[in-house]
Design a protein with these regions (language model features):
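Acidic (Asp/Glu-rich) sequence patches and key acidic residues
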Residues: 1-146
């Protein structure tokens, strides 16, 4: 039996392989951005609460991180959705960096994300990947597998 881990996939249009990679499990980012989507509906999960603090109290622009979808497609409509996910890399880099910095700098956010202690490190790695793409004028796409 093969066990597939939840993974964030970061693709670029750079035409070359990004030399930066995740140094640990990227599932924490997938869980965080997924819960950030549910925050507007009053989700009670600690990651959703962290997203609410980031968005509403600290005014961190998380929008570029919330532009993602399942990498597996089952029909043409989902394929079109994946194509619409390409976005400028610099805002993704800034958002990932800003969220990581906010988590590290806030006792409240550290407490809310305590079950995901590597989240800031993974976000910084994502920021490095996106910055690398931005330096090349490339776009990025965030997808995941579960």
């Amino acid at each position: 039996m093969t066990v597939q881990l939840t993974t964030l996939i970061v693709e670029t249009t750079a035409g070359e392989e990004c030399p930066v990679e995740f140094l640990g499990d990227s599932a924490d980012i997938v869980y965080f951005i997924s819960m950030a989507h549910t925050e507007r509906y009053g989700a009670d999960h600690p990651l959703a609460k962290a997203a609410a603090v980031l968005k509403r109290q600290l005014r961190v622009n998380m929008a570029p991180l919330l532009n993602f979808a399942d990498a597996r497609v089952e029909n043409e409509e989902e394929e079109r959705l994946l194509e619409r996910l390409w976005q400028d890399a610099a805002p993704v880099a800034a958002a990932a960096r800003d969220v990581a910095q906010a988590i590290e700098g806030s006792p409240q956010l550290r407490e809310l994300t305590a079950d995901f202690p590597e989240l800031p490190a993974r976000l910084r790695e994502l920021a490095e990947m996106a910055a690398w793409a931005a330096e090349r004028g490339a776009k990025v796409r965030l997808t995941f597998v579960i």
